[in-house]
């Protein structure tokens, strides 16, 4: 490692592995006019077609890209309502093969009826009962009724974990909650006990009022920021600088946490009144504390990334965050160690054939696209 930088590897606080085969897929039958239509015409249309092989290919190719980007741990939020049974174990085994740590969940909701809702609860209980680590996943307040919300919190308590849910990503979530329950999204989640669980993850948190911010600020739960996805979906920019526990995620847009950290840094001037490079780097690193809270495999000190970075200016411990925010990218990732095992060696995945993974992903993408 002479002349190289060695740092802890990266973790993704919120991913959607199931979207990996969406790159370049056929357009929606109608151009979405708002966030709800993005869900209805794009993602909900796609996730209903996923089967075991598509899910496996999605996990393998996501694992490949994570590893090559220096990401050795993934917190994922999965959806495949008509191929639900065993889906979490399929993802777990694929990520294990690549060598990544993970905390998985299935995003249970009421959008596909009672039978699918019950299957989501059963899948979650079975996965967590098997000894795997993860969360109890929910889609969002506007697709989760009171029965499901209460049972999800009970299930999380049973397994000593948290609830992983999208929160006020679009303003529609708040409008539905006010109309249906007479309260804000975060107040509803707080009343149900979600915010009492230290391992709960609230994704996005874009449209919050002052009371909701106070509820989150005084709770032990986590918030995850997904800047690029929020920009892509035109839902707005969240403000996160007053929350004590904030992680960074990609929301399935990609698997590059260097890029996510830089995006959060560059957008902070608009959303948060500015942020220092050190603060952006610390936000990137916050995920490690969440992982350690689960005692999950892959959260230890034997997870490292070796960076090949030739700087034209002096590089010191003090100015490292500035170099990171302005100059680093995934091309600097040379080798990666995950749980003490070399999984990327000089830019190539170790122990698996990259070409085979990509060919499998292409095959499954064609199958998926033919169904859309």
Name these PLM-found stretches:
Residues 281-372:
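Active-site microenvironment of metallo-dependent hydrolases
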Residues 6, 25-78, 82-100, 122-129, ...:
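Alpha-helical scaffold segments that flank or form the walls of functional sites
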Residues 83-206:
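Metal-coordinating catalytic core of metallo-dependent amide/deamination hydrolases
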Residues 203, 207-244, 249:
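A conserved active-site cap/scaffold subdomain adjacent to cofactor or substrate pockets
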Residues 8-20, 162-171:
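Histidine-centered catalytic micro-motifs
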Residues 1-7:
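Histidine-rich, glycine-flanked metal-binding segment
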Residues 191-197, 239-309, 327-328:
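His/Asp/Glu-enriched, well-ordered alpha-helical/loop segment
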Residues 21-55, 113, 167, 171-197, ...:
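Active-site gating loops and adjacent loop-to-helix segments of metal-dependent hydrolytic enzymes
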């Amino acid at each position: 490692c002479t002349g190289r930088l060695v740092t802890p590897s990266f973790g993704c606080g919120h991913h959607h592995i199931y979207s990996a085969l969406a790159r370049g897929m056929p357009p929606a039958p109608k151009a979405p006019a708002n966030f709800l239509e993005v869900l209805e015409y794009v993602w909900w249309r796609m996730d209903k077609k996923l089967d075991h092989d598509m899910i496996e290919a999605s996990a393998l190719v996501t694992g490949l890209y994570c590893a090559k980007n220096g990401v050795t741990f993934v917190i994922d939020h999965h959806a495949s309502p008509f191929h639900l049974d065993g889906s979490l174990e399929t993802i777990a085994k694929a990520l294990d093969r690549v060598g990544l740590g993970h905390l998985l969940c299935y995003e249970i909701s009421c959008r596909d009826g009672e039978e699918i809702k019950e299957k989501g609860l059963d899948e979650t209980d079975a996965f967590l009962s098997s000894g795997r680590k993860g969360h109890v996943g929910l889609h969002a307040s506007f697709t989760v009724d009171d029965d499901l919300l209460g049972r999800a919190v009970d299930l999380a308590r049973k397994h000593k974990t948290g609830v992983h849910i999208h929160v006020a990503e679009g303003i529609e979530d708040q409008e539905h909650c006010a109309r249906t329950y007479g309260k804000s999204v975060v107040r509803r989640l707080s009343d149900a006990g979600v915010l009492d669980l230290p391992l709960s993850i609230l994704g996005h948190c874009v449209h919050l009022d002052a009371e909701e911010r106070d509820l989150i600020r005084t709770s032990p739960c986590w918030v995850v920021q997904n800047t690029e996805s929020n920009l892509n979906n035109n839902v707005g920019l969240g403000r996160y600088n007053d929350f004590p526990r904030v992680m960074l995620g990609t929301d399935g847009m990609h698997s590059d946490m260097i890029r996510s950290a830089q995006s959060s840094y560059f957008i902070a001037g608009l959303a948060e009144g500015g942020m220092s490079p050190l603060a952006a780097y610390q936000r990137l690193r916050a995920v490690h504390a969440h992982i350690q809270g689960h005692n999950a495999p892959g959260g230890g000190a034997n997870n490292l990334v070796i960076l090949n970075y030739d700087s034209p200016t002096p590089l010191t411990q003090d100015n490292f965050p500035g170099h990171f925010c302005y100059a680093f990218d995934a091309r600097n990732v040379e080798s990666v160690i995950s749980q003490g095992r070399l999984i990327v060696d000089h830019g190539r995945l170790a122990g698996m054939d990259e070409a085979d993974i990509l060919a499998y992903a292409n095959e499954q993408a064609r199958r998926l696209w033919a169904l859309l």
